[in-house]
């Protein structure tokens, strides 16, 4: 499980809020958060950079989430996570994990959220120009200042995570508690040619998480709709034309996995999307899928995945480990 400096344990499914308050208006955003909380959810994920790609969107996610938390008086009842250290969108080669950059991002995030601390602070990207010691020291200091309770990494390689863990242990500093990366039942390769890639679960990374039981917080856990209603109808018709959703995931292996997911779902009387999420919850290490939606019904559907107990035979049929 995630080890937090808190008595609150995060719910197994996390709510992502990337375009809340921007493309997803305030009313719809609040309705989704209400439904998530009503279903037992308490783990919220946002980021300093979110919606910077939209006109007047930068900061809207953190502000909208913060307003909802204050309105409902829930700050001490939830796990609040945000991310910083993301490169400028027009200069993705630029590392931003220096002490002054993290200080700036964190301060602005706390101000937008209207809180004194966050439970988890993720570094949105690595900064290979910085030693892991410098990064570990920076985040450890913010924990000592009670501005964050724990920290994690997002889109880091296993090698750099191992280096940070070893450094923190060696010098009695605070280690990262989890890795946030792309992970769903559908495989997707990391674009290693990208200057600062979004990293996706692969067989080697999966093996490391299995060996160490290091927790994974999984973005794109629903593969941008690849296991949704539209794609299931498309699969039942024999895959005519392009995939209605999740086209970046489409391929022979994922189509086979989609068909098996549909079969398991039909046998159980649940949805393929619920089965796909349940697979992540049945891994040999802790996985906390992040869901992202603007529809209340999708939140309720996703949260029910926690009640599905898959058998070893079903997991084998689904080939639920990343591509070998």
Question: Where are the model-predicted features located?
Answer:
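N-terminal binding-site loop/beta-alpha segment at the start of enzyme catalytic domains
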Residues: 1-77, 144, 223
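N-terminal small/glycine-rich loop or linker at the start of catalytic domains
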Residues: 4-23, 81-94, 117, 122
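Beta/alpha (TIM)-barrel catalytic core signal, keyed to glycine-rich beta->alpha loops juxtaposed to Asp/Glu
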Residues: 126, 130-323
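A short acidic, helix-capping loop that chelates divalent metal ions and anchors anionic groups
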Residues: 50-54, 87-93, 187-192, 298-301
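Alpha-helix N-cap and loop-to-helix initiation/capping positions
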Residues: 24-31, 56-60, 64, 93-101, ...
């Amino acid at each position: 499980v995630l080890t937090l400096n808190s008595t609150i344990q995060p719910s197994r499914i996390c709510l992502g809020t990337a375009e809340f308050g921007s493309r997803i208006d305030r009313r719809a955003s609040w309705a989704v958060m209400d439904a998530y909380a009503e279903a037992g959810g308490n783990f919220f994920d946002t980021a300093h950079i979110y919606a910077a790609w939209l006109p007047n969107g930068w900061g809207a996610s953190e502000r909208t989430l913060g307003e909802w938390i204050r309105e409902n008086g829930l700050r001490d009842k939830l796990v609040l996570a945000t991310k910083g250290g993301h490169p400028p969108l027009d200069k993705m080669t630029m590392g931003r994990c220096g002490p002054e950059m993290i200080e700036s991002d964190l301060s602005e995030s706390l101000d937008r959220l209207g809180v004194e601390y966050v439970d988890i602070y993720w570094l949105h990207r690595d900064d290979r120009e910085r030693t892991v010691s410098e990064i570990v020291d920076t985040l450890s200091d913010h924990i000592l200042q009670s501005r964050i309770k724990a920290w994690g990494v997002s889109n880091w390689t296993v090698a750099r995570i191992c280096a940070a863990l070893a450094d923190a242990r060696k010098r009695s500093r605070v280690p990262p508690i989890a890795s946030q990366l792309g992970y769903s039942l559908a495989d997707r390769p990391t674009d290693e040619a990208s200057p600062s890639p979004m990293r996706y679960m692969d067989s080697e990374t999966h093996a490391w998480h299995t060996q160490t039981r290091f927790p994974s917080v999984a973005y794109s856990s629903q593969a941008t709709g690849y296991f949704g209603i539209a794609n299931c109808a498309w699969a039942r018709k024999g895959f005519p034309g392009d995939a209605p959703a999740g086209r970046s995931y489409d391929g022979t292996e994922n189509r086979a996995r989609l068909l098996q997911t549909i079969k398991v779902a039909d046998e159980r009387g649940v949805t393929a999307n619920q089965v796909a999420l349940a697979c992540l919850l049945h891994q040999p290490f802790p996985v906390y899928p992040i869901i992202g939606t603007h529809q209340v019904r999708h939140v309720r559907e996703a949260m029910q995945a926690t009640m599905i107990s898959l058998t070893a035979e079903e997991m084998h049929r689904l080939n639920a480990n990343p591509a070998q």
